[in-house]
Amino acid sequence: MSDNKSVLVLKVGGALLQCEMGMSRLMTAAAQMIATGQKVLLVHGGGCLVDEQLTANGKETIKLDGLRVTPEDQIPIVVGALAGTSNKILQAAAAKAGLVSVGMSLGDGNTVHAKIKDERLGLVGEVSPNDATYLNFILDQGWLPICSSIAVSADGLMLNVNADQAATALAKLVNGNLVLLSDVSGVLDGKGQLIASLNKTEIETLVKQGVIEKGMKVKVEAALEVAQWMGKPVQVASWRDAEQLKKLVLGQSVGTQIQP
């Protein structure tokens, strides 16, 4: 594998898992990039599957400021849906595209430090980069790491981590280029038009106006944090058009660029 290209860190949400065509296009694009020597790391959530499993088990989905609250009695269901079902659905899609993938979680290889984020959120974790050895080994083989957002704390707690924040920590760890992919084309203004570029001041204004809210607020704030930390833009774009990803390899902008 070539070391002269930085790692492309792709974060995908749960909605992708319900779209066979979307997964197929994304994995095909990833395979094409890896074939050229581009290292690709996939980080995923799975909120839709978590909600389905909670409902099936008679549990309620609770959110606070766009972040999932994870009570102790829900953590086995959340871990199963994210580190289990969601992760393996993506591995199956990778296999169909001819990729060698490694299914993993934030708890593998001492990759991150994890702690409770906020007692009000229950078993929700906050993670920081720790050791890239395991990830780098996988990437150096030309394999695709597919990482769920489940972490393990030093005192043995299983923690549910917001997938955008998980992707941020891993992008920092491998000094990668982060792309937050969702089922919308990027950040939209009040009229539903795509905004090509945003900086911190513009983001704060749109949050105050209620244009950026809930899940997109979490996504944009995560993107801004990593953009500032790494001194380079982060992309917020759509997995619905995986062809766009090839533009990223060429250094072209897609979706909304969040500026440092």
Curated annotation (Swiss-Prot):
EC number of the protein: 2.7.2.8
Gene: argB
Molecular function per GO: acetylglutamate kinase activity; ATP binding
Gene Ontology BP annotations: arginine biosynthetic process via ornithine; L-arginine biosynthetic process
Native species: Shewanella denitrificans (strain OS217 / ATCC BAA-1090 / DSM 15013)
InterPro entries cross-referenced by the UniProt entry: AceGlu_kinase-like_sf, AcgluKinase_fam, ArgB, Asp/Glu/Uridylate_kinase
Task performed by this protein: Catalyzes the ATP-dependent phosphorylation of N-acetyl-L-glutamate.
Enzyme class label: transferase
Site description Transition state stabilizer, residues in chain: 11, 219
Gene3D superfamilies: Acetylglutamate kinase-like
Chain residues that bind substrate: 46-47, 68, 160
Family: Belongs to the acetylglutamate kinase family. ArgB subfamily.
Classification lineage: Bacteria, Pseudomonadati, Pseudomonadota, Gammaproteobacteria, Alteromonadales
Catalytic activity: N-acetyl-L-glutamate + ATP = N-acetyl-L-glutamyl 5-phosphate + ADP
Short name of one Pfam family: AA_kinase
Cysteines joined through disulfide linkages: none
Pathway in which this enzyme or protein is active: Amino-acid biosynthesis; L-arginine biosynthesis; N(2)-acetyl-L-ornithine from L-glutamate: step 2/4
Keywords assigned: Amino-acid biosynthesis, Arginine biosynthesis, ATP-binding, Cytoplasm, Kinase, Nucleotide-binding, Transferase
SUPFAM superfamilies: Carbamate kinase-like
Entry GO CC: cytoplasm
Superkingdom, taxonomy of origin: Bacteria
Protein's name according to its UniProt entry: Acetylglutamate kinase
Subcellular location: Cytoplasm
